[in-house]
């Protein structure tokens, strides 16, 4: 996952032309994940380290989408060696990686149930066979599906069509949310309905509503994977922007401009579709990819242009 850049342009590895700044952004994101996952419990957790209960955005809500944005950039760089063609080698690599990440996510979910069962005094056999209540989806599964579909779209369609695909995914998803109670935290939410129909309640995450009721609602649901595919594709386009523009100043300028456009558009449209991580709303996609692009531009300006990188060794 390391990324190397050089000179006043950007230190690059000969094969992938990756930014050191991107590596630092990934490191910051991973550090954020560690901090959030070890932030305490309940009232002992600082408010900025909590997810928004429903609508809204906290610093914690930026961690997952930032990682997905970085994954989109890395996907562009990874697929360059296949010339973005749907060759057998490219498709097989995408499918293999998707299955592997998804399987790891399932395995971690199973292991959590296994250790929980042992701690409650269950036998090894009983603790190891709670498949009837194993959660199918999750964070790694979301990453796997978003990467897999986005990467396949990237090799099937020319890059000039990607913005249209992103728009279609986000607009189509917005219509589903509007028509299916998507912005309401309740069992009749279309996201919950689809997951119940496909997986069953036993295999879903149980979340708390703002009113204090616990219902079957998966924040990494199958339907809300649609906008996350668009999320990765936006990162993919920023990967193209970075590679096609060799001058660091140009990179910073374009990252800041497009990042501001995305963030401003998302903030403006939130009055018609609130920013919401748990349903991965279209405005959430726009705002978080915009912020991620701006942060990457800032890091390039600090690290690669002004060579202020001693502070970043912790994240490298």
Give the label of every model feature segment.
Residues 2-316:
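Alpha-helical transmembrane segments and their immediate juxtamembrane cytosolic regions
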């Amino acid at each position: 996952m390391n990324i190397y850049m050089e000179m006043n342009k950007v230190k690059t590895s000969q094969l992938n032309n990756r930014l050191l700044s991107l590596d630092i952004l990934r490191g910051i994101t991973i550090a954020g994940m560690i901090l959030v996952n070890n932030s305490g419990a309940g009232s002992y957790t600082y408010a900025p380290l909590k997810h928004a209960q429903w609508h809204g955005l906290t610093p914690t809500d930026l961690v997952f989408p930032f990682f997905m944005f970085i994954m989109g950039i890395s996907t562009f760089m990874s697929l360059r060696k296949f010339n973005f063609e749907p060759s057998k080698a490219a498709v097989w690599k995408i499918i293999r990686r998707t299955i592997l990440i998804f399987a790891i996510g399932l395995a971690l979910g199973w292991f959590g149930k296994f250790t929980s069962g042992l701690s409650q005094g269950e036998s090894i056999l009983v603790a190891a066979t709670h498949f009837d209540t194993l959660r199918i989806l999750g964070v790694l599964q979301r990453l796997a599906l978003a990467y897999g579909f986005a990467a396949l779209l990237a090799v099937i369609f020319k890059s000039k069509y990607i913005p249209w695909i992103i728009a279609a995914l986000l607009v189509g998803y917005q219509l589903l949310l509007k028509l299916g109670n998507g912005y309401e935290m309740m069992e009749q939410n279309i996201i919950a309905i689809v997951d119940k129909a496909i997986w069953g309640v036993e295999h879903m995450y149980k979340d708390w509503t703002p009113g204090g009721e616990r219902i079957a609602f998966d924040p990494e649901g199958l339907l809300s994977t649609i906008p996350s595919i668009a999320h990765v594709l936006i990162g993919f386009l920023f990967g193209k922007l970075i590679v096609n523009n060799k001058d660091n100043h140009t990179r910073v300028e374009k990252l800041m401009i497009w990042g501001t456009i995305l963030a401003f558009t998302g903030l403006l449209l939130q009055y018609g579709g609130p920013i919401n991580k748990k349903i991965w709303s279209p405005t959430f996609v726009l705002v978080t990819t915009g912020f991620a692009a701006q942060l990457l531009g800032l890091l390039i300006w600090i690290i690669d242009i002004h060579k202020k990188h001693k502070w970043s060794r912790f994240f490298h």
